[in-house]
């Protein structure tokens, strides 16, 4: 290379732009990842919930995350906080439809029930779970994406089903080992009873307009019941002395509410009647309830629900009674942590350690045979693709939570055997796991027999 060429090359190198590392992207605020370390708690909750729902004869339903916006406007109520301020809504650029990420599950479950005529052959007990979305300020126990478990009893009118859905929650708290969760109940009566109460309530609240906050003033003539649900400390005395809806209930509504109370008492479920409990959704009538804990600060309500008899007809279906509940899973997971409930870590049955090309091939074949037999197996793979030493692999085997390590090297391949080392079964009783040499073609039977024996 000539001197001129050398100088030109050096100049080009100097002017070559520096490549900056790409900025790491982060998740949306208020929408959280569930990481492997959290999985045992979630599985603990989900397994308990599914078992409880099966015990009461509920069937699962799954609905889309996106629904027509009008579904929630009609179903939840136009003057609710959810519809007015919290929904993620957008216009579909393909057809101009107004769509919304679902903020709750009941409206969608009712829509599916009507659309697919699920009540044609009688009442249904349905349950659902999945992510919901609300555009609000993230804080402990309140997120923009959260997960909800819900149950809907459709086509049942009696107080027995109101009581049963409350009992379902209590059974779940017991199964999860949760304590200190208290039940509050109320009755919202029927539409005509609420109208009579509403008239008197508005007159009462008008006398406090000088102290009402902006939210309460906005609701005064549209949804005055929600004013009683205020969290504003300055309005608590006003709300406590307001006309009580229960004083406006007729004989049928009172009989229904008394029936719920009788059944709760018969099943030894303690409760408190809270005349200010109205829930945040417009579709409720008669029974409403909330399960509350003092261990999560301001976000203490972990489940709530009640009866919503008008909703099915309101959404275009044949009139049918209904009731149900929903619970926020993240809040319950947080409560499980607060209670110190620690579910067993989820480990595999077998970790396969190998070294050498022939051993790697045999290990993969052995892993598939063990999986065919119903065992959970992790086959060692190293980050650099070179396998790693037996010592480093055994460290990974121990960290995996496996009950057994199966070890295959060149000597084992040549002899047609494998080494099986116990990692868990006897380390407490005998100071460490034992190791055995096992014929390769007898590995499946050996491990199954060993695991059965260890569980007895």
Curated annotation (Swiss-Prot):
Native organism: Cupriavidus taiwanensis (strain DSM 17343 / BCRC 17206 / CCUG 44338 / CIP 107171 / LMG 19424 / R1)
GO terms of biological process kind: histidyl-tRNA aminoacylation
Annotated family: Belongs to the class-II aminoacyl-tRNA synthetase family.
Annotated catalysed reactions: tRNA(His) + L-histidine + ATP = L-histidyl-tRNA(His) + AMP + diphosphate + H(+)
CDD domains hit by this protein: HisRS-like_core (cd00773), HisRS_anticodon (cd00859)
Disulfide bonds: none
Self-association state and partner proteins as the record states: Homodimer.
GO cellular component, one term: cytoplasm
Gene field: hisS
GO molecular function, one term: ATP binding
Top-level taxon of the source organism: Bacteria
InterPro entries recorded: aa-tRNA-synth_II (IPR006195), aa-tRNA-synth_II/BPL/LPL (IPR045864), Anticodon-bd (IPR004154), Anticodon-bd_dom_sf (IPR036621), His-tRNA-ligase (IPR015807), HisRS-like_core (IPR041715), HisRS/HisZ (IPR004516), HisRS_anticodon (IPR033656)
Name the record gives this protein: Histidine--tRNA ligase
Organism ancestry: Bacteria, Pseudomonadati, Pseudomonadota, Betaproteobacteria, Burkholderiales
């Amino acid at each position: 290379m000539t001197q001129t060429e050398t100088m030109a090359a050096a100049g080009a190198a100097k002017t070559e732009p520096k490549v900056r590392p790409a900025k790491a992207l982060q998740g949306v605020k208020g929408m959280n990842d569930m990481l492997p370390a959290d999985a045992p708690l979630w599985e603990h909750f989900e397994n308990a919930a599914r078992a409880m729902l099966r015990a009461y004869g509920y069937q699962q339903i799954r609905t889309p995350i996106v629904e027509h916006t009008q579904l929630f406007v009609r179903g939840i109520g136009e003057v609710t906080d959810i519809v007015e301020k919290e929904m993620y809504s957008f216009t579909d650029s393909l057809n101009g439809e107004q769509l919304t990420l679902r903020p709750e599950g009941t409206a969608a479950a009712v829509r599916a029930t009507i659309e697919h005529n699920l009540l044609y052959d009688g009442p249904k007990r349905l349950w659902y779970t999945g992510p919901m979305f609300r555009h609000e300020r993230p804080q402990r126990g309140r997120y923009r994406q959260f997960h909800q478990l819900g149950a809907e009893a459709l086509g049942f009118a009696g107080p027995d089903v109101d009581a049963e859905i409350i009992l379902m929650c209590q059974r779940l708290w017991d199964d999860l080992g949760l304590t200190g969760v208290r039940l509050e109940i109320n009755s919202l009566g029927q539409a005509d009873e609420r109208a009579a109460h509403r008239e008197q309530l508005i007159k009462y609240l008008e006398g406090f307009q000088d102290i009402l906050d902006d939210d309460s003033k906005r609701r005064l003539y549209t949804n005055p019941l929600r004013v009683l649900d205020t969290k504003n400390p300055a309005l608590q005395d006003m709300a406590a002395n307001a006309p009580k809806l229960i004083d406006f209930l007729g004989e049928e509504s009172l009989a229904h509410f008394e029936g719920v109370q009788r059944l709760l008492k018969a099943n030894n479920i303690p409760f408190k009647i809270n005349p200010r409990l109205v829930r945040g959704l417009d579709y409720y009538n008669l029974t409403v309830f909330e399960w509350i804990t003092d261990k999560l600060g301001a976000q203490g309500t972990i489940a709530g629900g009640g009866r919503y008899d008008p909703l099915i007809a309101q959404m275009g279906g044949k009139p049918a009674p209904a009731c149900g509940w929903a619970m926020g899973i993240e809040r319950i997971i947080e409560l499980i942590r607060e209670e110190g409930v620690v579910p067993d870590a989820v480990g595999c049955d077998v970790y396969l350690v190998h070294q050498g090309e022939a051993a790697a091939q045999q290990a993969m074949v052995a892993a598939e045979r063990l999986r065919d037999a119903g065992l959970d197996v992790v086959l060692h793979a190293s980050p650099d693709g070179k396998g790693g030493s037996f010592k480093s692999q055994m460290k990974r085997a121990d960290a995996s939570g496996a009950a057994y390590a199966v070890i295959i090297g060149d000597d084992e391949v040549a002899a047609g055997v494998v080494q099986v080392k116990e990692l868990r079964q006897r380390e407490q009783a005998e100071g460490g796991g034992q190791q055995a040499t096992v014929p390769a073609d007898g590995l499946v039977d050996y491990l199954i027999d060993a695991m059965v024996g260890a569980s007895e």
